[in-house]
C-alpha cells in the first residue's frame, strides 16, 4: 500500500494478522507452507505446498500478464486460501507493489479504503460473488476501469455475469486450477475467447478411464490425475 518494509517486525503493526502470519511462514526456514486441498477430489485435507512450486507458478502468471516491479497487484482475497497466498507470492517474485484491502463482498468500495483512489491496478483476483456484488454499485462498477487484468475463480462464472463483463474495459479471465496445482494452470478470456487455454508448458490429456491428466512441468509433482 505504498509502504516499503525491510523486516517482518515493521509489518506486524500495519498488516492484517492473517497476512502477517502467512509472510512469517513464507520467510521461515521450511521449504513449504501449509494449505488445504480444494476438495474437488475428496474431503479437503491439510497439505504441504512447496515454496519452490509457488514461486514457479507465480513466475508463470507474472510472465503471462507482464507483471514486473512497476506493477500494482490487488489482494482482496483471504490468504487462508491458495488464491490469496499466490497473489502475495506474485508480488514478492516480481518486486511489485501489493495493494491490500479488507476482504469483503465489495472489494472495490472506496469508503475506509482511500488508498484505492485513482490507483491503477495491473492484476487482481476475485471470486464471482465479489464481482457480482461490485457490479451492482455504479461507483464500484466504474472502478473496474482501473483494473487492467482480473482473474475470477473459486466458483463458476454464470452466463449472466459473463455477459455483463463484456461491457467493462477490464480484461477478465476465468481460472482453472486447484490447490494441488498451486493455483491456476489454465485461463479463459471471458470478454472474448470461448475456451480455456493452458499457461506456460502445461498440458492436458486423458487416461484409459477417461480421467483428466494434468501435465505441469513447472511443478515438482509434474503430473496430476
Residue map of PLM features:
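Short beta-strand->loop structural element characteristic of the AMP-binding/adenylate-forming
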Residues: 1-14, 45-48, 97-104
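Conserved pre-ATP/AMP-binding loop-to-beta segment of ANL
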Residues: 18-36, 70
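Conserved AMP-binding A3 loop
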Residues: 32-59, 66
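Conserved S/T- and glycine-rich ATP-binding loop of Class I adenylate-forming
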Residues: 37-40, 73, 88, 124, ...
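AMP-binding/adenylate-forming
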Residues: 51-56, 72-133
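Glycine-rich helix-loop-beta junction characteristic of Rossmann-like nucleotide cofactor-binding loops
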Residues: 63-68, 115, 140-143
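Gly/Ser/Thr-rich phosphate-binding loop
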Residues: 137-192
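Conserved ATP-binding loop and adjacent catalytic segment of the adenylate-forming AMP-binding
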Residues: 170-210, 216-222
Amino acid at each position: 500500500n505504498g509502504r516499503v518494509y525491510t523486516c517482518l517486525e515493521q509489518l506486524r503493526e500495519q498488516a492484517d494478522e492473517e497476512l502477517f502470519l502467512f509472510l512469517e511462514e513464507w520467510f521461515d526456514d521450511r521449504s513449504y507452507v501449509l494449505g488445504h486441498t480444494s476438495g474437488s477430489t475428496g474431503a479437503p485435507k491439510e497439505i504441504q505446498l512447496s515454496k519452490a512450486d509457488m514461486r514457479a507458478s507465480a513466475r508463470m502468471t507474472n510472465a503471462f500478464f507482464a507483471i514486473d516491479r512497476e506493477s500494482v497487484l490487488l489482494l482482496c482475497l483471504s490468504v487462508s486460501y491458495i488464491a490469496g497466498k499466490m497473489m502475495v507470492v506474485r508480488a514478492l517474485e516480481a518486486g511489485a507493489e501489493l495493494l491490500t484491502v479488507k476482504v469483503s463482498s465489495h472489494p472495490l468500495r472506496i469508503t475506509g479504503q482511500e488508498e484505492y483512489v485513482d490507483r491503477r491496478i495491473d492484476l487482481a483476483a476475485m471470486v464471482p460473488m465479489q464481482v457480482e456484488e461490485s457490479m451492482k454499485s455504479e461507483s464500484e462498477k466504474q472502478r473496474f476501469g482501473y483494473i487492467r487484468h482480473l482473474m475470477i475463480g473459486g466458483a463458476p462464472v454464470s452466463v449472466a455475469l459473463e455477459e455483463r463483463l463484456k461491457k467493462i474495459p477490464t480484461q477478465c479471465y476465468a481460472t482453472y486450477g486447484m490447490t494441488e496445482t498451486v493455483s491456476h494452470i489454465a485461463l479463459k478470456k471471458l470478454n472474448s475467447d470461448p475456451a480455456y487455454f493452458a499457461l506456460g508448458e502445461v498440458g492436458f490429456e486423458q487416461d484409459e478411464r477417461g480421467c483428466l491428466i494434468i501435465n505441469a512441468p513447472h511443478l515438482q509433482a509434474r503430473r496430476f490425475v
